[in-house]
């Protein structure tokens, strides 16, 4: 998003300056240029904020296997580096309206996917954002809901990988 850097600086610039934090924003396609960015910044950690779940929309619907391969390749590219992501896992309509003041469901680690979707009041069909294999095995992943609108929820995943 070409406006992201401007909006981030507008919203957080004062706090960044107060702490002496230096912010560098790359406005190119960071995923396409990831190998070069990683090489140029060997000590930098990487955070994907609402990026990885959107990749399926940059390809034709028939190229879902290509999207999955690209997402799995990230684990290889980022091996040995600290990185994290917050992304959509699935999204879709709900069987009943979501009250504005309702608590956001958080997934219990023992729940299987279908039970979790039941807790979200998911009404088929839900869109699979193809991010089920983003994180390496063994990484603690938090699953929680985000109420996009009164009748539509997103299942979000967040995780942080340490080398």
Indicate where each model-derived feature is located:
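Conserved beta-strand signature within the Rossmann-like core of class I S-adenosyl-L-methionine
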Residues: 45-48, 66-91
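Short, glycine/charged-enriched secondary-structure capping and boundary segments
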Residues: 11-14, 60-62, 99-100
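Short beta-alpha junction loops
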Residues: 1-5, 87-92
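Short catalytic/ligand-binding loop motif for oxyanion handling, primarily in non-cytosolic enzymes
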Residues: 7, 54-59, 92-95
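S-adenosyl-L-methionine
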Residues: 1-41
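Charged, low-complexity C-terminal accessory regions
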Residues: 91-163
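A conditional alpha-helix N-cap/helix-loop micro-motif detector
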Residues: 27-28, 64-67
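A short SAM/SAH-binding and catalytic strip from SAM-dependent methyltransferases
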Residues: 31-37, 41-62
């Amino acid at each position: 998003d070409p406006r992201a850097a401007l909006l981030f600086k507008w919203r957080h610039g004062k706090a960044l300056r107060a702490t002496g934090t230096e912010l560098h924003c790359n406005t190119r396609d960071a995923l396409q240029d990831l190998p070069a960015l990683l090489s140029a910044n060997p000590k930098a950690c990487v955070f994907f904020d609402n990026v990885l779940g959107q990749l399926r929309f940059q390809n034709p619907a028939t190229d879902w296997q290509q999207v999955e391969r690209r997402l799995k390749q990230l684990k290889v590219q980022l091996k040995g580096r600290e990185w994290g992501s917050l992304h959509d896992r699935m999204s879709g309509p709900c069987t009943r309206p979501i009250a504005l003041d309702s608590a956001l469901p958080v997934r219990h680690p023992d729940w299987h996917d279908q039970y979790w979707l039941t807790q979200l009041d998911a009404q088929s069909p839900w869109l699979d954002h193809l991010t089920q294999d983003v994180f390496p095995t063994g990484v603690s992943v938090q699953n929680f809901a985000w109420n996009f609108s009164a009748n539509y929820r997103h299942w979000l995943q967040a995780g942080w990988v340490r080398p």
